[in-house]
C-alpha cells in the first residue's frame, strides 16, 4: 500500500480522483510478523526435513488476535541446511504473528538507530518465542550460537509495505468494492501490480 500511495502521489493528474486516492490510502492492512533467525552450534541439532507449525490453543483460527499474556498463540519453525548430506541444521527460522501496534512507538526511526529500548524489546520477544520453542523441541536453546530478529518495522522499511503487512490489504467480504484495487487505472497504459491487486 505504501508503494501504491507513493505512486499515486507522483501522479499529478485530475484523472486520479481524490476520493480514489483516499480510499486506497485508508484500506486497513493485514497482520505483520516477528521472526527469529537462529544460528546453531555445528553438528548439534539434527536436521528436520519438514516445517513445524504449532498452535498453542485448540483452534488454528484467530492466532493474530493476542495480548501480552498469550503471545505467541502460534508459530512456524523450519531448519536450514546447505549441505548435500542434511544431517545437522545450520540454522532455523522461527516466525509468529506480530501487530504493528507492538512497535508503533518506534515509528519514524531509522534502521540501526531505533535505540536500546527497541533492542531490549526485540530481545525480550525473541527469548519469549524461543522459550515456547524449547517446550516443543527440548534442548534447542543450549545449541544456539546466536540469533537475529526482525519486526514489523523491519518489513515496513525493507519492503515499503505499510505497517510491514504480510498479506497486503485486509479484504472485506461484506464490502468487497471498498477493498478492491483494480489493476487498471484511469491513466492510459498505467497498470497496477502486486499483492494488493492479486496480479503479480
Predicted feature descriptions by range:
Residues 6-9, 89-128:
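Conserved FAD/dinucleotide-binding core of flavoprotein oxidoreductases
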Residues 33-34, 107-118, 191-197:
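Glycine- and acidic
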Residues 83-89, 180-185:
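Short glycine/proline-enriched loop/turn "hinge" motifs that connect secondary-structure elements
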Amino acid at each position: 500500500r505504501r508503494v501504491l500511495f507513493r505512486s499515486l502521489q507522483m501522479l499529478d493528474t485530475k484523472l486520479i480522483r481524490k476520493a480514489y486516492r483516499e480510499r486506497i490510502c485508508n484500506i486497513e492492512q493485514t497482520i505483520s510478523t516477528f521472526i527469529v533467525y537462529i544460528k546453531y552450534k555445528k553438528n548439534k541439532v539434527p536436521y528436520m526435513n519438514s516445517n513445524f507449525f504449532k498452535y498453542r490453543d485448540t483452534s488454528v483460527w484467530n492466532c493474530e488476535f493476542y495480548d501480552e499474556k498469550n503471545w505467541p498463540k502460534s508459530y512456524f519453525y523450519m531448519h536450514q541446511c546447505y549441505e548435500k548430506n542434511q544431517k545437522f541444521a545450520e540454522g532455523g527460522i522461527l516466525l509468529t504473528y506480530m501487530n504493528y501496534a507492538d512497535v508503533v512507538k518506534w515509528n519514524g526511526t531509522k534502521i540501526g538507530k531505533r535505540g536500546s529500548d527497541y533492542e531490549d524489546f526485540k530481545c525480550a520477544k525473541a527469548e519469549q518465542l524461543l522459550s515456547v520453542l524449547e517446550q516443543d523441541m527440548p534442548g534447542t536453546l543450549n545449541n544456539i550460537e546466536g540469533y537475529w530478529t526482525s519486526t514489523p518495522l523491519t518489513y515496513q522499511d525493507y519492503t515499503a509495505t505499510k505497517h510491514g503487512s504480510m498479506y497486503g490489504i485486509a479484504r472485506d467480504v461484506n464490502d468487497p468494492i471498498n477493498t478492491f484495487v483494480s489493476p487498471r487505472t484511469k491513466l492510459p497504459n498505467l497498470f497496477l501490480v502486486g499483492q494488493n491487486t492479486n496480479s503479480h
